[in-house]
Curated annotation (Swiss-Prot):
PANTHER family, alphabetized: NADH-UBIQUINONE OXIDOREDUCTASE CHAIN 4L, NADH-UBIQUINONE OXIDOREDUCTASE SUBUNIT ND4L
Gene3D superfamilies: 1.10.287.3510
Record's bilayer topology term: Multi-pass membrane protein
Transmembrane keyword on record: yes
MF (Gene Ontology): NADH:ubiquinone reductase (non-electrogenic) activity; quinone binding
Name assigned to this protein: NADH-quinone oxidoreductase subunit K
GO biological process: ATP synthesis coupled electron transport
Function: NDH-1 shuttles electrons from NADH, via FMN and iron-sulfur (Fe-S) centers, to quinones in the respiratory chain. The immediate electron acceptor for the enzyme in this species is believed to be ubiquinone. Couples the redox reaction to proton translocation (for every two electrons transferred, four hydrogen ions are translocated across the cytoplasmic membrane), and thus conserves the redox energy in a proton gradient.
InterPro entries: NADH_UbQ_OxRdtase_chain4L/K, NUOK/Mnh_C1-like
Keywords: Cell inner membrane, Cell membrane, Membrane, NAD, Quinone, Translocase, Transmembrane, Transmembrane helix, Transport, Ubiquinone
The protein's Enzyme Commission number: 7.1.1.-
Lineage per the UniProt record: Bacteria, Pseudomonadati, Thermodesulfobacteriota, Desulfovibrionia, Desulfovibrionales
Ranges that cross the membrane: 1-21, 29-49, 62-82
Amino acid sequence: MIVPLSHVLAVAALLFAVGGVMAAARRSILLILIGVEFMLAAAGLAFAGAGLAWNNLDGQAAVIIIMGLASAEAGLGLALLVHGRRGGGTDRADSYDRLGEES
């Protein structure tokens, strides 16, 4: 049994909204990264569902690209978090406005 496209898009929209709220409302850089990952997963779900509904492999190709983008985002974000924590800082997002300055 194939799930209807409207159901897949509704779940993707809900997942995207949860990720957007999490990324916008949180102060911790780790929780912001998790919110962005939710949003990327929602986009991948929408692409995969649309590809399945229209019998097209472009949706699966887009999911592979999104997975690569998500892994690059996670790597850069966690490197930023480790860099900030090693400098005696915190994981709060508002403390990252002065990374380039010498203090």
